[in-house]
Amino acid sequence: MSQSSASSIFTVSRLNQTVRQLLEMEMGQIWLTAEISNFSQPSSGHWYFTLKDDRAQVRCAMFRNTNRRTTFRPQNGQQVLVRASITLYEPRGDYQLIAESMQPAGDGLLQQQFEQLKQQLAAEGLFDQSHKQPLPSPAKQVGVITSSSGAALHDVLQVLQRRDPSLPVIIYPTAVQGADAPLQIVRAIQLANLRGECDVLIVGRGGGSLEDLWSFNDERVARAIFNSRIPIVSAVGHETDVTIADFVADLRAPTPSAAAELVSRNQIELVRQIQGQQQRMEMAMDYYLAQRHQQLTRLEHRLQQQHPHLRLARQQTLLLKLQRRLEDSAQNQIRRLSRRTERLQQRLVQAQPQGQIHRYNQRVQQQEYRLRQALERQLNGYRQRFGIACSQLEAVSPLATLARGYSVTQTPEGSLLKTTKQVHTGDKLTTRLQDGWVESEITQIKVAKKPRQRKAAN
């Protein structure tokens, strides 16, 4: 066996693993329509069942976290549409499906077609807001594309009659259900654009099942709505119903009645608006007239102010004011001159020599008196200070001490004798008494004993 052949030998585990990886990578998710059989739900909550047709079958599992989103409980024998991933259970080598979503086959196929067309048209830009046309306000004439015998037309006409009876309505009858309905709807839209009678179109019908509303999920209808030069309001079914026409239309209304309200004006509200505008116009007119009346009054007043008699009276009044001002000015000038003359006379009197001499004499006398008083006060102060100094000197003078019976003895050198150590026998001393001096000679020196000091008690 060659080396290349040996490297291609698989084990069972490797084979199953490789096949699983190939299935998951190459197939990915698929949509599958089939019949359910062998359905079971163990305590784990997962669903296990078989999907089959008349020629083959495949095992399938749907885990609990996924099957919670399913809106129905599958039954054996039920046709379903399943979106699933292909994988392989390696321990047994069985390939199986892991379901991601499930729905009954009828509605499921239609829903799948709806999603595919929606993605296609969205990719082409048919849903972009940049292509949406604004609705006219107000609409001059409304076109309605729907069944002539349906409840939708009755609802639209009833709302328009109630809200805006004067608004013209053109009906383009068409089938809204069945195989021929999409083409009829397309032709009605094209006819309305060809005639150009209306400035807005309502395209819709009443409620129904998904199959009943399927004409408005037709690609031809969607493209006709997109190509319309006239703005289109879609009004298909009830508020919960959503169709491709709703995405393409310039505006979606939840119901035909709501569409009629969107394209019409409320007559009661219109009357209220007109009344409000009339009231505002009346207020504006009243304000305008009041302003003009005030302007006229001001002009009349100005005209009266320009009358010759009034102008003459104003000039006379002005002349009297000027005359009074002139008289007052002359009187003030005279008073100022009089006061100035008086001041000059006073200065002249004060400038005469006799007056100055008299004033100087008075000032000299005053200064002499003040000087005498100052000298007297100063002399008294000196006397007091001298008396105090004498008293203080007398208190510390040695003569005062001698007068009290004491004497002062001096050594031959003239020093005061204070101790026996200063003199010797034969020295001559001079003693000062109160009334003179006495000279003496030392014949004997005696030293006094110091008194004994007592010891302190222990």
From Swiss-Prot:
InterPro entries: Exonuc_VII_L, Exonuc_VII_lsu_C, OB-fold_nuc-bd_dom. It catalyses: Exonucleolytic cleavage in either 5'- to 3'- or 3'- to 5'-direction to yield nucleoside 5'-phosphates. One of its GO terms (biological process) is DNA catabolic process. The keyword Disulfide bond does not apply. Its EC number is 3.1.11.6. Keywords: Cytoplasm, Exonuclease, Hydrolase, Nuclease. The keyword Cytoplasm applies. Disulfide bonds: none annotated. It comes from the Bacteria. PANTHER family: EXODEOXYRIBONUCLEASE 7 LARGE SUBUNIT (PTHR30008:SF0). HAMAP family: Exonuc_7_L (MF_00378). Bidirectionally degrades single-stranded DNA into large acid-insoluble oligonucleotides, which are then degraded further into small acid-soluble oligonucleotides. This is Exodeoxyribonuclease 7 large subunit. It comes from Yersinia enterocolitica serotype O:8 / biotype 1B (strain NCTC 13174 / 8081).
